[in-house]
Amino acid sequence: MKGIVIGVSLSGKTTVAKYFRSNTSISVSEMDEELTKLNNGKYPTDVEHKHKSLAPKVIKGFLNKKDVLFFTNTDYFSLDDLRKAKDKGFKIIQLELGLDELNKRNKNRVKNEGYDDLSKWLEGMILYQKKIRNAGVVDIVIDASLSVERISEEIQGVFVK
């Protein structure tokens, strides 16, 4: 299984990744974890360093893996990166959630979980999702408002076709 799951912040990527780790034998990796490893155990806060130096190293190493389901936020993979991934047999899976629901989740996280307010970035993330979908590199779009079990089934279904 070789897959890239791309979702906007707040779309449930980490929840789905945790579900896969707890309920399947599928090898799972997350961009944030890999960036943290490369940055001496601290999540990189310097956006330029993260995107220009660390993320390309993560992507290069990841594209050579034989069996992995890789969860990532938007904007790390360029269209060329995604095309290379497809050429190497990766399926590109997109988690989709509307702006209204993303804003609700954002408000809840800010108020109840102490997260930073991501509202100013959400529209740009949605545009990235549309761009890669319109470029034809996405194999399947999954409604991120479904249950984690259903999302897991949909993702796994991509690999049995």
Where do the model's predicted regions map?
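ATP-binding Walker
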Residues: 11
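Hydrophobic anchor at the beta1->P-loop junction of P-loop NTPases
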Residues: 5
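Glycine-rich phosphate-binding loop used to anchor ATP phosphates in small-molecule kinases
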Residues: 49-91
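Walker A/P-loop
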Residues: 14
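Conserved phosphate-donor/acceptor-positioning beta-strand/loop module used by diverse small-molecule
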Residues: 86-106
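Small-molecule kinase domains that catalyze NTP-dependent phosphoryl transfer to phosphate-bearing small molecules
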Residues: 112-154
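Conserved substrate/cofactor phosphate-moiety recognition/catalytic segment
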Residues: 18-63
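P-loop (Walker A) phosphate-binding loop of NTP-binding proteins
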Residues: 8
